[in-house]
Amino acid sequence: MKRNFPKLIALSLILSLSVTPIANAESNSNIKAKDKKHVQVNVEDKSIPTEVRNLAQKDYLSYVTSLDKIYNKEKASYTLGEPFKIYKFNKKSDGNYYFPVLNTEGNIDYIVTISPKVTKYSSSSSKYTINVSPFLSKVLNQYKDQQITILTNSKGYYVVTQNHKAKLVLKTPRLEDKKLKKTESIPTGNNVTQLKQKASVTMPTSQFKSNNYTYNEQYVNKLENFKIRETQGNNGWCAGYTMSALLNATYNTNKYHAEAVMRFLHPNLQGQRFQFTGLTPREMIYFGQTQGRSPQLLNRMTTYNEVDNLTKNNKGIAVLGSRVESRNGMHAGHAMAVVGNAKLDNGQEVIIIWNPWDNGFMTQDAKNNVIPVSNGDHYQWYSSIYGY
């Protein structure tokens, strides 16, 4: 499937973190670690709308707990660090607000992304949407006591050190330059390195909260054997990755691989024609049928109850999305897999989704048909294929 390259965006960071864990984090509601250094993210300004801040503080633990249960992680305690923003090279924000979720060791486990609603396409009535995933958490944790900048373009995410060399740290599936170098020079005078304020993203902003009660009480439903076995590279095979993951889960096997699926369906294509080919819904249904399944096309997003019932019955669901930002180019259409669903302790219903580009899962409001993805784009969930 085809996609246009988005513009380069940038996030400036200065990181330094002590090796000593935060002391007495459970009991101290006003944590001020003056003797500790923290990850500092450069921002143009630290202003966050009150509605956004309240939404993050109110709901983050429920979202995080749903992912913890999906990952079969133990009960834990979390808090939020200071929120930060991501900028384009013209110093304009990408419009989102990012809240790091800290564990008691002072490391970032998840990123809460709050976005203004994409009004034209979204079925949600809320002004903002919230999504939680690992996103850049591992990257932020890898550069302790170093001054860095994070940049992103169509090739992925880069860490820029003080010598202005950019290292690719998070590759996206949009790579098309076979001669891509792992380091690139960044102009020293670039204005994104001159943002004046700093957000202490690893400084706890409130008392740590245990998710013990939420973990025990919160309803989470998952395809029992769903695992991330491979991720999408420089190709158009999102549907192949999606179907492979779903069939591996529902058959409890490791035999399905995206490339083999694509070769089965397009045996005569070679070279770049094969590399960048995609699949139609009809081809996706046909492949499921050849594997002993009876997939059905639904010309809309599946409801929460439908996801709940299908997942309980070990039937996989493929998401078919259309990119909001551009309907042309590679990945203008994109397939993703439904991992399961959860009902948060505030009653909100969410669907757990795996994007083949990612090494982790993400939460999606069950009433919102626009899915934000890890490169900053949004996909309108317009159809589903269920029964894998």
From Swiss-Prot:
<feature type="propeptide">
    <location>
        <begin position="26"/>
        <end position="214"/>
    </location>
</feature>
<feature type="active site">
    <location>
        <position position="238"/>
    </location>
</feature>
<dbReference type="InterPro" id="IPR025660">
    <property type="entry name" value="Pept_his_AS"/>
</dbReference>
<dbReference type="InterPro" id="IPR028076">
    <property type="entry name" value="Staphopain_pro"/>
</dbReference>
<keyword id="KW-0645">Protease</keyword>
<keyword id="KW-0788">Thiol protease</keyword>
<dbReference type="Pfam" id="PF05543">
    <property type="entry name" value="Peptidase_C47"/>
</dbReference>
<dbReference type="InterPro" id="IPR046350">
    <property type="entry name" value="Cystatin_sf"/>
</dbReference>
<dbReference type="InterPro" id="IPR037155">
    <property type="entry name" value="Staphopain_pro_sf"/>
</dbReference>
<keyword id="KW-0964">Secreted</keyword>
<feature type="signal peptide">
    <location>
        <begin position="1"/>
        <end position="25"/>
    </location>
</feature>
<feature type="active site">
    <location>
        <position position="334"/>
    </location>
</feature>
<dbReference type="GO" id="GO:0006508">
    <property type="term" value="P:proteolysis"/>
</dbReference>
<keyword id="KW-0843">Virulence</keyword>
<comment type="subunit">
    <text>In the cytoplasm, prematurely activated/folded ScpA forms a stable non-covalent complex with ScpB.</text>
</comment>
<feature type="active site">
    <location>
        <position position="355"/>
    </location>
</feature>
<feature type="site" description="Cleavage">
    <location>
        <begin position="214"/>
        <end position="215"/>
    </location>
</feature>
<dbReference type="Pfam" id="PF14731">
    <property type="entry name" value="Staphopain_pro"/>
</dbReference>
<keyword id="KW-0378">Hydrolase</keyword>
<dbReference type="InterPro" id="IPR008750">
    <property type="entry name" value="Peptidase_C47"/>
</dbReference>
<comment type="function">
    <text>Cysteine protease that plays an important role in the inhibition of host innate immune response. Cleaves host elastins found in connective tissues, pulmonary surfactant protein A in the lungs, and the chemokine receptor CXCR2 on leukocytes. Proteolytic cleavage of surfactant protein A impairs bacterial phagocytosis by neutrophils while CXCR2 degradation blocks neutrophil activation and chemotaxis. Additionally, promotes vascular leakage by activating the plasma kallikerin/kinin system, resulting in hypotension.</text>
</comment>
<protein>
    <recommendedName>
        <fullName>Staphopain A</fullName>
        <ecNumber>3.4.22.48</ecNumber>
    </recommendedName>
</protein>
<dbReference type="GO" id="GO:0005576">
    <property type="term" value="C:extracellular region"/>
</dbReference>
<keyword id="KW-0865">Zymogen</keyword>
<dbReference type="GO" id="GO:0008234">
    <property type="term" value="F:cysteine-type peptidase activity"/>
</dbReference>
<comment type="similarity">
    <text>Belongs to the peptidase C47 family.</text>
</comment>
<dbReference type="InterPro" id="IPR038765">
    <property type="entry name" value="Papain-like_cys_pep_sf"/>
</dbReference>
<keyword id="KW-0732">Signal</keyword>
